[in-house]
Amino acid sequence: MLKNILSLMMNKFKKLNFLNIFFFIILFLILSCAEENPVRIIRLAHGLDTSHSVHKAMLKADTILNILSEGKMKIKIYPNQQLGSERECLELLQIGSLDMTKVSGAVLENFAPKLKIFGLPFLFKDKTHLFKVLDGQIGKELLEESEKYWLKGIGFYDSGSRSFYTKNKPIEKPIDLKGLKIRVQESVSAFQMVEQLGASPTPISWGELYTALQQGVVDGAENNPPSFYLSKHYEVCKYYSINEHTSIPDVLIVSTHFWNRLSDKEKEW
């Protein structure tokens, strides 16, 4: 009787052992295949609305990258300041917690001082002049400026020209700005420009600006027409005065922590 029980237990053990080995082999094969064909996800954050042309361009970039990499690399986009303000996103890149971001050159100047040049009013003759600078040697040097801070510039976005918009009166000449509280980006050059024009520069996050205008914290701001429209700031500000005082490009930035992990082929994609 005991012999039969032991024999039965041994047979069950052998069956269980065989099943364990079988499932282990299957699991090993699955993991091996996964390691051979990993999908690298690029985490990209920005502060714009999903209806903005820049966001749509990023979606297109993801489609193209997916084709070029044959599905091995994709972009996961976090719009609308989901991961923080532009400066906060740059700081996430610096510690490797985020892979890519799009920021205004005005904000990036805190990490790349040479970009302050874009804060000078009426610097460019026209768009042709601007693009010649951005696409040439000067633009290349400006993109490299922030690498010592773990931020690698890989390209510019044309963000249009900035003009003043206000709640209660149009800005037809510099004296019209005197005494007004004008929202500016986190930029020394923007702060100084508005101050020199006689207004009170007030740094406010883009995501908080609508409420600040509504509650009278500031009397106006300055930005390009698409941003003015898509943010619905026209609901609060009656006047958009087209003076196009600056043309500050946006910059696409990648964390050097992420960049240095890529192969040469992946960098080409």
Question: Regions from the language model: what does each represent?
Answer:
Residues M1-I41:
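Short, low-complexity disordered leader/linker segments with a strong preference
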Residues C33-T128, I138, S146-W269:
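N-terminal secretory/targeting leader peptides
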